[in-house]
């Protein structure tokens, strides 16, 4: 299927180094962006008239907790992934499938490996509403061998996570070996930071743990739900090069502390946005949009940069092609505009004012998944007009 998207008012790239691009049209073929420019006029199966509104990459949720299927036992909710798609989310990155009913917490090594393999294989075969669920994240526990990391890499698992590992065992050196084994195989390492989570058995981790283990991603550094102390957050920004995750489940005040440190150190490219849902915070279809609006409207992040934190920064930190609108990338994108009654001029101005915009279309791999209007946002002021070629 080919798609021509024309009359774009503002193109937000998702690239934090170049967050806006001057172009009014975009052509998609075979699920990827083939061309971006001005006045593109190519025959297409689907023509989308953006009517001068904003186009941005599909949102990449850096921190989600799927189990199996479009259902979460954490809130006994059906269809949550489909609802997130209507909130502009096109990729979900699993921070562990730890809400599986009956899962021993913490799991032993054999159980943790089995769960990661099973989740990886199941989510390779299922995409609710077309959403890409990057699952099979291994929960790191004592007792793993280097050969286990060979198996993870062979299965295509690309993320492991410290959350239940007993840090009293750090002097043994096993945790550092896990990081080295993962890195040698192209597997990213995430670390649950801050206080204890809903499970009651996650391990507390502040700056000292982060500085020792040096994960690729510091999970919910602003709290999930409780953050590390302010001085620790500042130390992690200043003293490491780890990616810094901001989640909807966390402490809003700590986001302001984090962003002050990020500005001081020019670290905007390290900030990632996630929801840390489903969980005790609930199911949040608009969670990613709300976090962008908070960063732009309260933390004074330029809105196109805040979008990059929820798209391209996340993709880059996790080694994914998704999150940036440029030639050759997956055609995952969102068309959106201000909501009727908003004082904003457009979607980016809405974010800058702390408002939510309204979504009129979502494409994943070039296929329309939401059209007309989202089920999860108010309608946009100027909905996109979609025409399909007959025959």
Residue ranges and their predicted role:
Residues 42, 50-114:
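Metal-associated gating/positioning segment near the N- to mid-region
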Residues 80-111, 120-141, 154-167, 186-190, ...:
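Divalent metal-dependent hydrolysis catalytic cores, especially in the metallo-beta-lactamase
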Residues 157-263, 267-282, 299:
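Active-site core of metal-dependent hydrolases
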Residues 330-384:
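C-terminal cap of metal-dependent C-N hydrolases
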Residues 62-75, 131-145:
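Active-site mouth loops of central-metabolism enzymes
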Residues 260-339:
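His/Asp/Glu-enriched, well-ordered alpha-helical/loop segment
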Residues 73-81, 141-152, 200-209:
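Short, acidic/polar
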Residues 1-42:
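N-terminal metal-binding scaffold of metallo-dependent hydrolase/deaminase domains
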